[in-house]
Amino acid sequence: MRFTVAIDGPAAAGKGTISRAVATHFRFAHLDTGLLYRAVGAKVTEGADPVAAAEGLDLADLARDDLRSAEAGQAASRVAALPEVRAALVAFQRSFARREGGAVLDGRDIGTVICPEAEVKLFVTASDEERARRRWLELAAKGGTQSEAEILADLRERDRRDREREAAPLRPAPDALLLDTTELTIDAAVNKAIEAIELRQAQGRE
């Protein structure tokens, strides 16, 4: 059985949390595609060529402890704007998406570029201020020293870069379900996603 769930959205909107919960609920495989770009970005900050880093990426690179840092996020956004880097990572993502048993992929262009044929497409968003608060709490728990205002500025700059890039700009797929998590608890947001997937599965059985 092949069933693909594409979950897109800006940073700290909740798509990663929702994706992991959905994958666990349905026993689907999960891929955080942002980690691919963060891993490439981290290699580039160490002096690697972006395209070579993308072509040589392996699963071990996705386990680095520094991939959730603000620096890795900014580097990811920069390398993601390079068409050659995106092309090098597309095949990996598409192969993962059509694996047997179902798959959940979260990122910024899954429903629009990587898997436009996905059975379910969600676009998860939240207000800038709420996303900054969430990311600040996440980083502070790990000993981060960035202020909430600095994180807000970083998020807005990354959003601008992601929306304006020529290669796969950040935007909802025309048939994506919009899920605004600003006022939702994690459980409520996850339940909405599960309901959308179950509805699509039921339609497929009709």
Swiss-Prot record:
It is found in: Cytoplasm. Keywords: ATP-binding, Cytoplasm, Kinase, Nucleotide-binding, Transferase. One of its GO terms (biological process) is pyrimidine nucleotide metabolic process. InterPro entries: Cytidylate_kin, Cytidylate_kinase_dom, P-loop_NTPase. The keyword Ribonucleoprotein does not apply. GO terms for cellular component: cytoplasm. Gene3D superfamilies: P-loop containing nucleotide triphosphate hydrolases. Residues 155-174 are annotated as: Disordered. GO terms for molecular function: ATP binding; CMP kinase activity; dCMP kinase activity. Residues 155-168 have a biased composition (Basic and acidic residues). It comes from the Bacteria. It catalyses: CMP + ATP = CDP + ADP; dCMP + ATP = dCDP + ADP. ATP binds at residues 9-17. Its EC number is 2.7.4.25. It is an enzyme of class 2 (transferase). Belongs to the cytidylate kinase family. Type 1 subfamily. This is Cytidylate kinase. It comes from Cereibacter sphaeroides (strain KD131 / KCTC 12085). The lineage of its organism: Bacteria, Pseudomonadati, Pseudomonadota, Alphaproteobacteria, Rhodobacterales.
